[in-house]
Amino acid sequence: MSSQPVTFQAPVAPIVPTAWPVDDVLALFNLPFNELMFRAQTVHREHFDPSEVELATLLSIKTGGCPEDCGYCPQAARYDTGVTAQKILPLEEVLTAAREAKAHGATRFCMGAAWREPKDRDLEKVEEMVREVKAMGMETCATLGMLGEGQAEKLKNAGLDYYNHNLDTAPEFYSNVISTRDYQNRIDTLARVRNVGIKVCCGGIVGMGESRLQRAGLIAQLCNMDPYPESVPVNNLVQVEGTPLHGTDPIDPLEFVRTVAVARITMPKARVRLSAGRREMGEAIQALCFVAGANSIFYGDKLLTTGNPEALADQELLEKLGMHTRSTAIDARCDVTPS
């Protein structure tokens, strides 16, 4: 392992864990469950109200037709998943969705597009969406694929708060998931985003057939970024018929909880978000994830093209747990630079 921390200066070399070597992250995974949960909750309480959860909404502004071959994704054009390619949504349709999300308590509005990378003419439309949603008093996030030179600056100038670009998995497992984009492509995009002052939303997907060591490797990659992401989505694979990963043995639910806990311990100031796969978890596992340090969820009946718990079900769960939602778009603790 290299002894030098990685800094965001595009282009950058692949991230090599230093402050949290993979073996140390793996040791957290291997702790007795109660000990791991205690440590995660202790860290969580040092930086956040343990009863608060952030509501974020994710809208697909351009669905289907993606040329990539991500093995988990129903939006890849090469897979027969029943997803029909659509053009980018009109501005007013996006704004209507944002208004509805805000009315239901969401403080962050995320816009996703199934592109390998955005064309400049499409990026201009996204910039307008960002400006208008930002004017509503909501935080803005976009996930548009890889960004070329100058594109991150345009999004920053439009007022974008966060850019999502997941690492997906550990470098050692990456070739089992995707072949049309390499790991360095992802690192380069994250570097461009970080260098212009946009906050980074970056996490991964578990349950794709990876080992515990490889899950530890993913978290080591994330937590050794300098700085680590402000927002860390943890996705549980939603298996979609027609994709190569359909039929993969699912991850044990308690192993998913462990993953959330390890993310919290290694990235103490990040928003750790329960993302895809919540509908399949059930209330008990979601509750354990909150104890493990998750403090953000995607709210709404759909995430891009896959299902999500109904809004009413989420409200009822949070009431059962005595949790409350983040009430403003500005959270001073979340804005502190991670360290």
UniProtKB/Swiss-Prot annotation:
[4Fe-4S] cluster binds at residues 66, 70, 73. Pathway: Cofactor biosynthesis; biotin biosynthesis; biotin from 7,8-diaminononanoate: step 2/2. GO terms for molecular function: 2 iron, 2 sulfur cluster binding; 4 iron, 4 sulfur cluster binding; biotin synthase activity; iron ion binding. Residues 51-278 form the Radical SAM core domain. GO terms for biological process: biotin biosynthetic process. It is an enzyme of class 2 (transferase). Disulfide bonds: none annotated. It catalyses: (4R,5S)-dethiobiotin + (sulfur carrier)-SH + 2 reduced [2Fe-2S]-[ferredoxin] + 2 S-adenosyl-L-methionine = (sulfur carrier)-H + biotin + 2 5'-deoxyadenosine + 2 L-methionine + 2 oxidized [2Fe-2S]-[ferredoxin]. SUPFAM superfamilies: Radical SAM enzymes (SSF102114). Its cofactor is [4Fe-4S] cluster; [2Fe-2S] cluster. Binds 1 [4Fe-4S] cluster. The cluster is coordinated with 3 cysteines and an exchangeable S-adenosyl-L-methionine. Binds 1 [2Fe-2S] cluster. The cluster is coordinated with 3 cysteines and 1 arginine. The keyword 4Fe-4S applies. It holds the Pfam family Radical_SAM. Keywords: 2Fe-2S, 4Fe-4S, Biotin biosynthesis, Iron, Iron-sulfur, Metal-binding, S-adenosyl-L-methionine, Transferase. Its EC number is 2.8.1.6. [2Fe-2S] cluster binds at residues 110, 141, 201, 273. Catalyzes the conversion of dethiobiotin (DTB) to biotin by the insertion of a sulfur atom into dethiobiotin via a radical-based mechanism. Belongs to the radical SAM superfamily. Biotin synthase family. Homodimer. This is Biotin synthase. It comes from Herminiimonas arsenicoxydans. The gene is bioB.
